[in-house]
């Protein structure tokens, strides 16, 4: 697998889960002899919602909610066959979305 690159994008609502998962991925890749670039923190997406509290009147009574989507990027340069096998066997947290692309 020479001249290959594995790009891993992680998304999660909880920053502690995503940081824990990135540490596991980086340690696994380094243990198998691959060169790792990252984790690179990407911009956090903030979605804000405003909801009326009162069902009829009182337009001023509102609640505001926010959902933050944290993202990280990890590049694994020159992965070995052991690296790919170890990453496939890796068990990550349930709240983390993982996208893997080969390039």
UniProtKB/Swiss-Prot annotation:
GO CC, sorted alphabetically, is: ribonucleoprotein complex; ribosome
**Pfam hit, one:** Ribosomal_S10
The molecular function terms in GO held by this entry are: structural constituent of ribosome; tRNA binding
- UniProt keyword annotations, A-Z: Ribonucleoprotein, Ribosomal protein
One GO BP annotation here? translation
Matching entries from SMART domains are given as:
Ribosomal_S10
From what superkingdom does this record's organism come? Bacteria
* Task of the protein: Involved in the binding of tRNA to the ribosomes.
How does this polypeptide assemble, per the annotation? Answer: Part of the 30S ribosomal subunit.
Looking up NCBIfam families in the UniProt record yields: PRK00596.1, rpsJ_bact
Q: Describe the family membership recorded for this protein in Swiss-Prot or TrEMBL.
A: Belongs to the universal ribosomal protein uS10 family.
PANTHER family xref list: 30S RIBOSOMAL PROTEIN S10 FAMILY MEMBER
* Protein name (record): Small ribosomal subunit protein uS10
What organism is the protein native to?
Answer: Blochmanniella pennsylvanica (strain BPEN)
């Amino acid at each position: 697998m020479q001249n290959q690159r594995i790009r891993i994008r992680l998304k999660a609502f909880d920053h502690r889960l995503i940081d824990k998962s990135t540490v596991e991925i980086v340690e696994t890749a380094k243990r198998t002899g691959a060169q790792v670039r990252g984790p690179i923190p990407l911009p956090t997406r903030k979605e804000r919602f405003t909801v009326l509290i009162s069902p009829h009147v009182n337009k001023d009574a509102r609640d505001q909610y926010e959902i933050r989507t944290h993202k990280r990027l990890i590049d694994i340069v020159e992965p070995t066959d052991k690296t790919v096998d170890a990453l496939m066997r890796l068990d990550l947290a349930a709240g983390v979305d993982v996208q893997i692309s080969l390039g």
